[in-house]
Each structure stands twice: as structure tokens, then as C-alpha cells.
Amino acid sequence: MTSRKILVTSALPYANGEIHLGHLLEYIQADIWVRFQKMMGNECYYVCADDTHGTPIMLKSDELGITPETLIKGVSERHQADFKEFSIGFSKYHSTHSQENKDISANIYHKLNDAGFIKTRIISQAFDPEKQMFLPDRFIKGDCPKCGANDQYGDNCEICGVTYSPTELKNAKSIISDATPIAKDSEHYFFDLPQFETQLKAWIKEGHLQDEVSNKLSEWFEQGLQQWDISRDAPYFGFQIPDVEGKYFYVWLDAPIGYMASFKKLCDEQGLDFDEYFNKDSNTELYHFIGKDIVYFHALFWPAILMGSNYRTPSAIFVHGFLTVNGQKMSKSRGTFIQARTYLNHLNPECLRYYYAYKLSAKIDDIDLNLTDFKQRVNSDLVGKVVNIASRSTGFLVKKFNKTLSDYAIDPELYHEFVACGDIIKKHYEARNYNQAMREIMKLADKANQYIDEHKPWQLVKKDTKQVHDVTSLAINLFRVLMTYLKPVLPVMAKQAEMFLNIDAFNWQDLKRPLTKHQINTFKPLMSRIEDEKIEQVIEASKQNMQVVA
């Protein structure tokens, strides 16, 4: 079978905050898929970057008395440290504030402009007279023009849900200076999205999106596509629009181009062919993993920009839902707005990887991290089932058989049943239905433990050491099959299991033959149980984080 060439991206985390468990849902989802593709022998690259531009970055650095470059450098280092400990295996993690991104953004802009897809017009915006800067909607607060609710942002009311322009807000104030904004005219640059309506509809019909996403896009088409403002006025931290003084690319223009820039950096470092992956007639595969809150940008603007600049479009966009904790939106006051670092200070990252896999499917439903179920699921499935197979079998092999597996002929049909299940597990991984894959694997783990229970090696050892040798050797081989299937989800535990089994990296193809007359190493615990105390410590530490921020 010919190896596939695949490029995978995840949404870029913004460089003004820390990674939290909501972010990690997507990176773990994508990482599992990438690891699976590599196990299948496919050439698969996974790129990402910090999203570094925009008014919030400029203002935050100003508040801290440092340059934006210094701010984003420190944030990137922390982001990458968190990702590394959660085993997110990026081929390249870059920054949107890079020469590659600047060059590609300018190139795309010139192509769009030359083709007549960039328009200009004068617009009126809210302007802070004290800070001498135009204000994004989220930097203005006031009273809702419809229901009168206080302290509402400049784009929509969180109380009654109405949307409006900042100029309609009553008693409006700049959240930067507390000054009353004034209206000021400015020339802005627009991407003419409506020109691509026919092409976008055709692209969507080709099946690049989940059905739920396609249905949502149909609603937007019915409302009518609008030209997209791709410019912002100085002062602004970002890339200046070529040949236009005092105008910068809006962050949402150069952010998705950051996917291309990150891959370009990887290509330059490893001698890969960038054009092979992004030329209009490319035969490679391109997949974006994103959350449902940024579908509009990725399923309309982004493909249209690629079409207009003569690049290939995504093979598919994989959309996931939001993360809730204990059935509710993450809350700082309840201690359920959990940062990655807070989790890492108390719990094993592989536990979260498994729980997310147990919950994730190809649908865009929200995922709930129920902390009680999280503890019970990890303790039951990983510790009580999978690891238990190895731990309860190894002692006999160490004490009686010099840690060497038998050349057994006992119950070969059970081993082959485990191997045959690999086909359906592969299909579930490929389709991103990890929840179904985990359930299949745990059914097998139950069978392995049932097999040990039925043969009772602790009793057999008194009268039939040969059968004990065969039973425990088969159990170890069943454990090997399960860990091969779990490797995309649990890479660290899989590595430890490889060392215990004294083998090279787990490989689906190697499962055709069981290990016989093979010496293993001393067993060391692969996973510890989650205790209530640890979860309580995470919640309490998250509450403390809120107080520090406040």
C-alpha cells in the first residue's frame, strides 16, 4: 500500500494567556490522530504556532513595560513546555510573528489584490481620544441599547443576546483609558468574500466538513456573505500591509497563514517540498483540527483566501465541541478553569489523554470532563484492567521461568481474536471515533483478565508449572496487543511497556506473531491510581490561580 502524505494543523493558541484543559482537548485529539497515522506507516507532519498579533498583545506588553516580542517569546516557551509534557508531538511549533509568515502573508495579499479581490472603503469606528487609537469592539463597554444591561461589550449583549455596533452602545467607555469613545473615519481594506460564494458552496458539497458544520454554513449563505475587513489601523502589533502606511493585517488574516508558515519553516529545516503540499494540484492531504467557535474563519474565509491566491484547499476540517467540567462551563471561582501547568503539578498527563480519547468522537458535541468519572475511568480501565494484566502475570515469569516467555501452543485462537480486532480499531482511529476504539480495547482487556481468572495461575503453580508458563506468557502477549492499540493515546506508558517487554517500538504489523522464548525485563508500575486528594489539590490550586490573577 502506498504511503499517504499528510499535513495536520491545530488552531493556534493566542499568546496572551496560558494553556488550559479546554485548549488541550484539541491538541490531544490531533496528536492521537497523527501518532496513529505514523504507526500506519504514513508520512504525517503536525504543525502549529503561537498566534501573536493583535491589540491585546500590544496592550499587555505595554502594561508590563516590555516589548511585544519579549512578551510572546516568554509565552511561547511556556506553551511549548506544557505541550511537551502532555506528549503533543509537533513536527514544528513556530510563531506567527516570523519572517516566513510575513513573506507568505504579503505574497497572498499581492495575489488577492492583483486579482481584484481586495476592496477599500471608508468606515467609521470607535476611537479612544486619550490613547489615540481605534478600539476593537471588546475594548468598549457600556449599556445595552436594547435591554439597558450595564457593563456590556461593544459588539453584543450577554444578557439579551442582541448584536449591535459600538456606536449604538449607551454610556460607552474605553476599557483602556475610561474615556468616552468618539466616532472617527478611516479607510479600511476588505477581502471580497462574496465573490467566492459559488466556489465555496461547491467545495462544501464535496464533503470536506462534518454534516453539522455544512448545515451551519448553509444558514450563513442564506444570510448572505459579507466583505471581510482585513485591516487595522496603527498602533497595532502585526504585519504592515505592503505599500500602505499605518495599516496592518488583521490578526485573523495572518493567523491561518501561520499554518503555511510553520510548515515552510519545517520544510526549510528538513529539506521538504513546500509546494508539494500547497500547490493547487497537490495530491497530499491537509487537515485542520479546530473548535466549533472558529468555523466561520476556517470554513469560509480561509478556503476562499486559498482559492483566491491559487493554493490548494483543505482536504477536511475536523471540528470538535467545547470542554465542560462537571457538566458546566469552566469556572475560575469553582476551580474548574484548570491550566495545563496546574494539572501537571498534581496529575499524570497520560490520564487526561486517555479520558479525552474515551470521550472524543467525530461529532461536534461538547465533551464533559467529569472529575469523579475521570478518576473512576482511569483507575478502572488503565490501572484495573490493562496494567493489571501485566502486573498479575509477571511475578510467575520472574520467579519460575527466568523472565522468559514460553514457546506456547495454548489458546492461539484467543491471541488471533485480539489481533483481528485491530481492523475495527484502526477504522475507529482513522474516523476520529476514539471513544469507540477505547471501548473495543477495554472489551479485550476484560477478556484477558477473564482468561487469567479462569485459569488461576496462582493455583496452577502448585501442580502444573508448564500450564502456568503458557497462561502467563499468553497474558503478556495479550498485554502487548493492547498496548500497541493504545500507543497513539498513551505514548509514554507505551514506551515504558516496550522497555518492560524488551522489544522495539510497538508496531501493528509485528502483532501477527506472538513473542515466544523471549526474555522480558523486570516489571515496574506503569500507572498509579488517581486519588481524590490529587483532584482536590488541582481544584484548590486553580482557585488560588484566580486569586493571583485578580
From Swiss-Prot:
Its main location: cytoplasm. It is an enzyme of class 6 (ligase). Zn(2+) binds at C144, C147, C157, C160. Its cofactor is Zn(2+). It catalyses: tRNA(Met) + L-methionine + ATP = L-methionyl-tRNA(Met) + AMP + diphosphate. It is found in: Cytoplasm. InterPro entries: aa-tRNA-synth_I_CS, Anticodon_Met, Met-tRNA_ligase_1, Met-tRNA_synth, Methionyl/Leucyl_tRNA_Synth, MetRS_core, MetRS_Zn, Rossmann-like_a/b/a_fold. GO terms for cellular component: cytosol. GO terms for molecular function: ATP binding; metal ion binding; methionine-tRNA ligase activity. Its EC number is 6.1.1.10. A motif ('KMSKS' region) lies at residues 329-333. Keywords: Aminoacyl-tRNA synthetase, ATP-binding, Cytoplasm, Ligase, Metal-binding, Nucleotide-binding, Protein biosynthesis, Zinc. Binds 1 zinc ion per subunit. ATP binds at K332. SUPFAM superfamilies: Anticodon-binding domain of a subclass of class I aminoacyl-tRNA synthetases (SSF47323), Methionyl-tRNA synthetase (MetRS), Zn-domain (SSF57770), Nucleotidylyl transferase (SSF52374). A motif ('HIGH' region) lies at residues 13-23. Pfam families: Anticodon_3, tRNA-synt_1g. One of its GO terms (biological process) is methionyl-tRNA aminoacylation. Is required not only for elongation of protein synthesis but also for the initiation of all mRNA translation through initiator tRNA(fMet) aminoacylation. Monomer. NCBIfam families: metG, PRK00133.1. This is Methionine--tRNA ligase.
